């Protein structure tokens, strides 16, 4: 099975070694065809607490690290200004 990866924006870094990443997915509506944007939030492990709010990051699926955390930050693609 392939390892799942997502790209998203950090929306919260208030927790220790954990960030909340919002990931957008765009798909056409099944009946009307309009592109619909859906946002899903993932809790991801950030070992060095490097991520700041607004950073664009790549996350990867991993083994369960806590009750709700199953993703880890691979790299920070761009920092917020």
From Swiss-Prot:
GO terms for molecular function: rRNA binding; structural constituent of ribosome. Pfam families: Ribosomal_S17. GO terms for biological process: translation. InterPro entries: NA-bd_OB-fold, Ribosomal_uS17, Ribosomal_uS17_bact/chlr, Ribosomal_uS17_CS. Keywords: Ribonucleoprotein, Ribosomal protein, RNA-binding, rRNA-binding. Part of the 30S ribosomal subunit. Belongs to the universal ribosomal protein uS17 family. One of the primary rRNA binding proteins, it binds specifically to the 5'-end of 16S ribosomal RNA. PANTHER family: 40S RIBOSOMAL PROTEIN S11 FAMILY MEMBER, SMALL RIBOSOMAL SUBUNIT PROTEIN US17M. HAMAP family: Ribosomal_uS17_B (MF_01345_B). This is Small ribosomal subunit protein uS17. It comes from Synechocystis sp. (strain ATCC 27184 / PCC 6803 / Kazusa). The gene is rpsQ.
């Amino acid at each position: 099975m392939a390892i799942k990866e997502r790209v998203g924006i950090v929306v919260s870094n208030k927790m220790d070694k954990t960030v909340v990443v919002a990931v957008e997915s765009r798909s056409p509506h099944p009946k009307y065809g309009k592109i619909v944007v859906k946002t899903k939030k993932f809790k991801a492990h950030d070992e060095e607490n490097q991520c700041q709010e607004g950073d664009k990051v790549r996350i990867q699926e991993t083994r369960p690290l806590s009750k709700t955390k199953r993703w880890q930050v691979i790299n920070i693609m761009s920092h917020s200004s």
